[in-house]
C-alpha cells in the first residue's frame, strides 16, 4: 500500500547552489539522496520504503552579488594562517531555501501516525539537504496517496505559494532534432545551451538606421524552463575494489563518471492535477544513473545515443 509523506516547508541554510555547469538551485540528485538516506533509516525502524520524491520551492536566497548581467558568489573570508597570510579556499556557491518534499512511501502504515510523523521530523532534521543544514521543518504529515484530480489539487493548494520542479528533458530531445535539421554539425551541448543562455537579437529600423534589441525566447512551448543536472553517466569501466588509488572507499568497486544534464520547468503548485507527475525517481541502466519523472515519457535519459560530446 502506497502513502504520501509530506515534509512541509523545510528551512535549509547554506545549501549547495552549484550543480555541474548550472547554478541557482541544487541538483535533483541532492533531494533523491536525502530521500534515500531517510528511507534506509525507516527500513530499519519501521520496515517502510521511500520510492519517489517531489520538490516544491517556496523561497530561496542565493548568496551572490552584482548586476543582472554579472554576478559573483558571496564567499566567506577564512582566518589568516599562522604566517599571517590569506588562507587558501575553494570557491563555493551557497544559498538559503525553503522547500517542501512529497515522498511516496510503500509499506504498512500504523493507524495512528503521530509517532511516525515525530520520528520522521527528528530523523530529517539530523540529515543534510544539498549540503545545507536543516534549520526547521514546519510540519510532517502522512496520508493516503491521492488517486484523482480533486484529491491532488487539495494537497497542492496547501503548499501554495510554491513552484514544483518538473522534468521537461523531452523538450531537449525535440529541440536537438530540430537544430540538426538546420545545422547538421550541431551537438547535444548546443541544444542544451539554447535553454541555458540568455540571447538577444538586434532588429534594424530602416527608417532611422537604429536597432532595437529584443529578447529571444527559449525553445519549447513556453513555461519557466531551466537547465538542470539530472544525474551521472559512466565514462570508464567498473574497476575492482582497490584497483584505483585514493578512492573514498577502497572496498567498493569504482567507476569514473561525469554529470548528465536535462531540462526542468517550474510550475505553480495549483497547476498539478496528478501527483505522479511530480515524483522524481532513480533510473539505472547501462552504467547511467539518472533522476527522472515517469510523466516525461520521452526523456533523453532513456536514450544513450543522445549525450554531450565534448
UniProtKB/Swiss-Prot annotation:
Entry annotated with the keyword Flavoprotein: no
GO BP term (any one): defense response to virus
Stretch forming the signal peptide: none
Superkingdom of this protein's organism: Bacteria
Reported uses of this protein in biotechnology and industry: If the spacer DNA has a perfect match in the chromosome then toxicity results. Suppression of the toxic effects occurs via mutations in the CRISPR/Cas machinery, or via target deletion, which might contribute to genome plasticity. This CRISPR/Cas system can be used to remove genomic islands, and possibly other genomic regions.
Keywords carried by this UniProt record: Antiviral defense
Oxidoreductase listed as a keyword: no
CDD domains membership: Csy2_I-F
Upregulation: Expressed in late exponential phase (other phases not tested); part of a large cas-CRISPR3 polycistronic operon.
Entry's family note: Belongs to the CRISPR-associated Csy2 family.
Subunit: Interacts directly with Cys1; part of the probable Csy ribonucleoprotein complex with cys1, cys2, csy3, cas6f and crRNA.
Role played: CRISPR (clustered regularly interspaced short palindromic repeat) is an adaptive immune system that provides protection against mobile genetic elements (viruses, transposable elements and conjugative plasmids). CRISPR clusters contain sequences complementary to antecedent mobile elements and target invading nucleic acids. CRISPR clusters are transcribed and processed into CRISPR RNA (crRNA).
Protein name: CRISPR-associated protein Csy2
